[in-house]
Amino acid sequence: MADFSDFHVADIALAGWGRKELNIAETEMPGLMATRDEYHAAQPLRGARIAGSLHMTVQTAVLIETLTALGAEVRWASCNIFSTQDHAAAAIAAAGIPVFAFKGESLDEYWEFSHKIFEWPEGQPANMILDDGGDATLLLMLGSKAEKDIGVIAHPTNEEETALFASIKRHLAIDPHWYSKRLEHIQGVTEETTTGVHRLYQLEKDGHLPFPAINVNDSVTKSKFDNLYGCRESLVDGIKRATDVMVAGKVAVVLGYGDVGKGCAQSLRGLGATVWVTEIDPICALQAAMEGYRVVRMDEVADQADIFVTATGNVGVITHEHMKKMRNNAIICNIGHFDSEIEVASLRQYQWENIKPQVDHIIFPDGKRVILLAEGRLVNLGCATGHPSFVMSNSFTNQVLAQIELFANGHKYEKKVYVLPKHLDEKVARLHLARIGARLTELSDQQAAYISVPKQGPYKPDHYRY
C-alpha cells in the first residue's frame, strides 16, 4: 500500500472502518459470496479490465472485490457526486484497487474521475464497462463524436453539460483521439439502472450502439427487488436522516408508480402518511388506485401536500411553478437516477440556506421556505447510505454474471441490448433463499410434466410478469 497512489478518496485513514463494514456486508450478500466460491477456480474474468461507474458504497465495494476475486482488473468512479461512502472508497483504495470517488464531488471532479477509469497504466485500455446511469458509456461516445465535430459540445444547456463538455475539451487538447482509441477496445457494457437502459435502447434504435450491452436492470431479481424493496427501505431512511420529520399524518405525493414508485408509496404509507400518486401510464395509474392511493395531477395538488418524491426517470416533473405553490417547509426530494426531475436550476435565483450536507432551505421572496434534499439528486444515497446489502446482492450478482457472459462470449452478440436468460435470474434468487430461511417446494415428475416445465426450472416464460 505504501507505494500505491493510483486513487483519489476523501481520507485513506478511513480504510479500517470501511473494511469492518465490508465484512458485515458480506454476511448479508450471499449471492456475491456464492458467486466467488463457484467461479474462483476458473477465473472467468482473467484479462478483463473493467471501467466501473457505480455508486461507491460499502455494497459496491463487495461487488468490486468479487470482480477482482474472479480475475478482473478494475478502475472505479462513483456515478453520483453525493453517493460515495468515503470509508468504503478508502477500503478499496487500501486494497490496492484504483478508485476515484468522494462524497460531495464538484461536477468538474466528477467528470475528471469518470475519465480516470479509462486511463489504465502501461497502455492497457479498458475492455469492459460496468455502468450505472450510462455516464461512462456516454463519455466515450460523446467524446468520440467531438473528435470529428467539436460543435457537438459547443453549446451546453445546463450546469452538468457545461462541466462535461469542458472536461472533454481538456482531454482532446491533450490527445485529439483520446476517446476513439479507448472506445474501440470496449467489448461490452452491463448497465445497472432504468435511466441508463433507456439510453442504451435509444442508441440501439438509432443504430449507434457501438458494442453489445446487457440490461441488468430488467432482470427480475434486480428490478422487482432493488427497485421495489430497496427503495421501500432507503427512501424513508434518507428523508428521516435529513429532516427528522414525522411522516405519520403527512400528505406525501409520489410522482411515478413504476417499481421504484411502488416501493416509495408503500414505505410512506407504512409510516402513516396519506399517499397520493401521479402517473402518465393508465395501467400504473390503475394499479395505484387499486392499492388505495389517490391518483392526482401535480398542478392540482402542489399546494396540498407536505412531502414530494420524484420517481419517474423523466425531466421537469416538479416545475418552478409547482414549487412556488407549495406549502411552507414542504420537503422535495428525488429518487430517480439524475437530478433532472426537479427544476433545481430555477431555484438558484432565490436565497439558499444550507442546514447540513445535502439539506437546503430555499427561501422565496415572500419568506416561504421549501426543503430540498440532496440538491435534487438521489435522496437515498445523498442523505443516507442507499439500499441494504441483501437486496443489492441480488442486483450485483446479476452484474457479475453479466460481466462474465459478455467478457467470455461477447463475440457471439450483436450490437444490441440483451437481458440475462431466465435460468440465471432464477439462479440469483435461489442463492438468496437460505439466508432468509426460505425453503423451496420441489415439483414431482408428474407435476412438472403437467405444467410442461423442467423440474429444476426455468419455471416461467420470458414474458411472465412477476
UniProtKB/Swiss-Prot annotation:
GO cellular component assignments: cytosol
Cofactors (names): NAD(+)
Known catalytic reactions: S-adenosyl-L-homocysteine + H2O = L-homocysteine + adenosine
Pathway assignment: Amino-acid biosynthesis; L-homocysteine biosynthesis; L-homocysteine from S-adenosyl-L-homocysteine: step 1/1
Coiled-coil regions listed: none
PROSITE patterns with a match to the protein in the record: ADOHCYASE_1, ADOHCYASE_2
Cofactor note text: Binds 1 NAD(+) per subunit.
Listed GO MF terms: adenosylhomocysteinase activity
Binding site for substrate: 57, 132, 192, 222, 226
Enzyme Commission code: 3.13.2.1
Superkingdom: Bacteria
InterPro entries noted in UniProt: Adenosylhomocyst_ase-like_sf, Adenosylhomocysteinase-like, Ado_hCys_hydrolase_NAD-bd, NAD(P)-bd_dom_sf, S-Ado-L-homoCys_hydrolase_CS
Pfam families documented for this protein: AdoHcyase (PF05221), AdoHcyase_NAD (PF00670)
Disulfide bridges in this chain: none
Enzyme category, top tier: hydrolase
Biological process (GO), any one: one-carbon metabolic process
Keyword check for Transmembrane: no
Keyword annotations of the record: Cytoplasm, Hydrolase, NAD, One-carbon metabolism
Keyword Hydrolase found: yes
Role of this protein: May play a key role in the regulation of the intracellular concentration of adenosylhomocysteine.
Family: Belongs to the adenosylhomocysteinase family.
HAMAP family: AdoHcyase
Protein name in the entry: Adenosylhomocysteinase
UniProt organism field: Chromobacterium violaceum (strain ATCC 12472 / DSM 30191 / JCM 1249 / CCUG 213 / NBRC 12614 / NCIMB 9131 / NCTC 9757 / MK)
Lineage start: Bacteria, Pseudomonadati, Pseudomonadota, Betaproteobacteria, Neisseriales
Gene symbol of the encoding locus: ahcY
